[in-house]
Swiss-Prot record:
Protein name: 3',5'-cyclic-AMP phosphodiesterase, isoform I
Free-text cofactor note: Binds 2 divalent metal cations per subunit. Site 1 may preferentially bind zinc ions, while site 2 has a preference for magnesium and/or manganese ions.
Positions annotated to bind 3',5'-cyclic AMP: H871, N872, S873, L874, H875, D912, D1029, Q1080
UniProt feature, compositional bias: Gly residues: 25-35, 59-77, 1182-1193
Pathway(s) per entry: Purine metabolism; 3',5'-cyclic AMP degradation; AMP from 3',5'-cyclic AMP: step 1/1
Catalysed reaction equations from the record: 3',5'-cyclic AMP + H2O = AMP + H(+)
Gene Ontology molecular functions: 3',5'-cyclic-AMP phosphodiesterase activity; 3',5'-cyclic-GMP phosphodiesterase activity; metal ion binding
Bias kind Polar residues: ranges: 275-290, 315-324, 385-400, 484-498, 627-645, 1199-1209
Keyword set, alphabetical order: cAMP, Hydrolase, Metal-binding
Low complexity: bias regions: 291-314, 372-383, 445-462, 472-483, 1164-1181
Recorded GO CC terms: cytosol; nucleus; synapse
Necessary cofactors: a divalent metal cation
Domain named PDEase: residues: 795-1124
Amino acid sequence: MMRLARFTQGFSFNKNVAKHRGSGSSNGTGNGSGTGNGQGLGGSCSANGLAATGGVGGGGGSGSGGGGCGSGSGSGSGKRKSKARTKCFGGTVFRCCLPCRGGGSAAPATSPPQTPAQTPDELKVIPEDCNLEKSAEQKRDLLERNNKEDDLLNRTVSGSELDLYGGAGGGTKKHSLADTIDTSVTTPISLKTLINDVDEELDQQLSAADIAAASLASGLVARRAEPETLSDASVSPTAVVQQQQQQQQQLQQPLLQSQPHFVPSSGNILSQVTLYSGSNPSTNPCQSAVQNQGQNSNPNPNQNPNTNPNQNQQRCSCQPQTSPLPHIKEEEESDQANFKHQTSLKEHQPLPPPITIATGYCGSCESVHHSSATSSSAGTVPPGGQQTQEYIAGTSSTPSPRIKLKFRKPHKSCWSRIVLAPIGSAGGSSSATTVIGSNSNETLASSSTTGGTATTTQNSSSVSVAAHHRLTSSSASALATSHPSNSQLLPTSKMQAEQGSIGDLQKYHSRYLKNRRHTLANVRFDVENGQGARSPLEGGSPSAGLVLQNLPQRRESFLYRSDSDFEMSPKSMSRNSSIASERFKEQEASILVDRSHGEDLIVTPFAQILASLRSVRNNLLSLTNVPASNKSRRPNQSSSASRSGNPPGAPLSQGEEAYTRLATDTIEELDWCLDQLETIQTHRSVSDMASLKFKRMLNKELSHFSESSRSGNQISEYICSTFLDKQQEFDLPSLRVEDNPELVAANAAAGQQSAGQYARSRSPRGPPMSQISGVKRPLSHTNSFTGERLPTFGVETPRENELGTLLGELDTWGIQIFSIGEFSVNRPLTCVAYTIFQSRELLTSLMIPPKTFLNFMSTLEDHYVKDNPFHNSLHAADVTQSTNVLLNTPALEGVFTPLEVGGALFAACIHDVDHPGLTNQFLVNSSSELALMYNDESVLENHHLAVAFKLLQNQGCDIFCNMQKKQRQTLRKMVIDIVLSTDMSKHMSLLADLKTMVETKKVAGSGVLLLDNYTDRIQVLENLVHCADLSNPTKPLPLYKRWVALLMEEFFLQGDKERESGMDISPMCDRHNATIEKSQVGFIDYIVHPLWETWADLVHPDAQDILDTLEENRDYYQSMIPPSPPPSGVDENPQEDRIRFQVTLEESDQENLAELEEGDESGGESTTTGTTGTTAASALSGAGGGGGGGGGMAPRTGGCQNQPQHGGM
């Protein structure tokens, strides 16, 4: 039925074409121009003088009927005859754009991007050299000899006529590589032809290009190409043929109804091709050609001024396709040299409309470009209607077919997504752009200028009219109009870089990753010394780099606010671009390098210094016009090196305004760098600069927070005393309580009253310090697992099925951990840890006996204090499960070794063992044995480590017994570092270190976080476990609320102890004055959100859902805060202004505030002041004083302490 359909259609075409026969002449170069009265539909495209795929050759066209990349070769009859197929190639490369493939179909990934080619089913006999002049008689003899080899299909319907509609006609002659030796060396064929046609029959085989074009024309959605594969089409050939038949039926009528008496000019090949305009889909496909004919009219019928014999070799303007493999660079260089020689011969000929392919390869550059509506012409049009436009030429890299065979790989996806950005003409034009399958990972903008307003329709012959209509319709919805921008499309996958679209992977990182926030390389190496690590820039690496996108717009943490007292430009976002001249900005935008790292905000001081110094270097190059030295140690990926390459504008001369402004800004930038460097203390690392800055900014934020409401003071003190390291407290611009004489005297008096009581209330002295307190004697269950069968989930439980269902979701964030604790008979840590180690096969890789593992976990869980509301084994199980989920982050896949993963999970299991339910500050203030043993430094964290490693010495509990000594030492070091990092007083230092490391790598130009040493790797793991420890606010709201209730109950129990012992009640530990809702808002704003913001930035976009949940929970608690009045009047004692946080009335006193305010009003000038911590009783006392002197010191009632809660400030 298919052959019958072709026969019928061909017969109707031939009958119609026969009406328009005329006389024509050939110019002897295979590029004749007809003078008859017929109309050559499909345009006057010709390539290399070859009679290739064509449309309906108009009568009288002696060679102007070709519609694809070839030219019609009819001898004045308008009816082209089919010819035997041979194949030829002169150089093949990886990919080709649409016009290079005859018949209007997209090219496969292996098609040449610079040289026209033809499909195997459409290729006919071709003259040996398109540049040699042949007489018409010789051509006819050659055609007659080849016509004898054709069958009935060749006599009835021309393969080239079907080709215009994407048909797959042609014979089934067997091909071999030997057939290509004696043919032309200027017209390559696709690699698919060479592979598929050798010693096998081709029965109407469709090319990948035809399939891709048909899938686009039919509205099919193209899938992205898989990494490390070449792009191709995988659509059913039957479906494609059906789509093509529908296109043929739709196009027959407009083609046959076209008006005769017209011969199009063949001046500019692509400008004479008819298509539907995206802005006017109903336009007659011949109208544009008629308009162009009026512009390109020529009195000489035999010679067109725009026609050039060498124009047959015009190639598309795809960017050069270079291979990243070093062993084929020599072949590429030789081919590039040959192409440059050929290009020099074509400088005098008219050039096709410019097309800039922002990605490495296109697939259908010209056809898609010309389907994008209209392009404005310049103010002046050269003779013949040729538009003067900028042509972006690139050298071609053409590996041999032998090399290409190595790149042919199986695939599962259609052609890659393409975004084209045509550049406006010299006179100025508004260039429309077309987007095919673009996504959020691709940045697109078309360069546009201002100029003339006259418009002409750009035409194309690469795909059928119906396909053009579909393409333009879909592209118009994606990008209706062009928008000016300086950014170009950046490659979206490492696959393109590996295939040669960028060159080598190092250049890929330099041009792409620098506009991304952070990148984490997927490499493995030994933890201690980094041996065995593969370079992430190694092209053969399975995942040489992970591109992490810019974060979406969301509320930023306080780290990005101004710190104007200490730096000139706090955000340093545009530190480079803000001081550069306009000419230098244009230079930056024109060469596709990062513009001061795009939208990123650099907040760490050391990274800001690096960015400023880089800016100074760039400005110096711009001012002096000295090219960057090739011997410079600056890497190629440095943005400054590429910026200084070829200045597009005239060099700045001394005396110009731009020169003076740039010089002044450079001096200011250098002064700022010097000021920052002079303040660095030599005994501290550069990360301490960020830590001190963040602490300083947090103190500023907390000062405003404490003044915003009456409860803000207590929350501010809690955050300062818990999350700020006391070791560097002297660097903070805050006043300690001891510096206030009056408060010292008041505290001394109060201390004398309670000294005896406090001394008597101290706990009895513990065991000798040579022993580790809290370690119990081995329990009976240690050797209880004597049978051969161990419990499925590590614990014996009657509800094993329900437990197994929940444990099956251990890789899910926000698991029902409380239900796991219930179903596991209060053994959540044992079952969670055992299941995770089993699923990750860590018991096998680390050679841990399962029985030994269960013995140790059971013993460890017994050493968690069950009476603690929060710090118990359920919290340890929650942190372990959260750590497991974070380790499964796609961005970290394959980064850490099993030893590192096992160490992180082990540290999460033990990080709070034998926790007494008290804070480090309480142990220090009470002079506990633990504080004395560990010198007040991370008291509990050191204790957790000591207990855990001591339990490993119990019989049958050493889970690392089969490890080598070096591995055991490495794991112990890792676990110690990770557990010590869970000390909340190290929070700011940990956050600053991570942010400094990330931003420094980003500013340095590499954009790749190598993690090639122990320090960097353990830093990521420390932050990972720290995030898991502070993950409660990021869990679903019901879980979060339950954890908050448990934590506050533990705080209140500590406050009760402090009250009973006569100690100062720690912030947020007084159950009578605590404000839970507002404390959680402050906790999220100043602690949790900055941490998770940095982590989400590192692994973007994998943690976006977690960050969204955090913001939702914060909004919930913000909505639950009761309205709070502003602080009361001004303090009478000016000396009290020096105190950091003044304890004021709480929200619980709202009922008494009205009475207090009435007393203030009746008392005239009397004001209510509180010099020390006050409670509801003091408020009542002040109000009862009427207008006399209300608000004074009230006696203690109800056990409340009349003492300042400085919280370690």
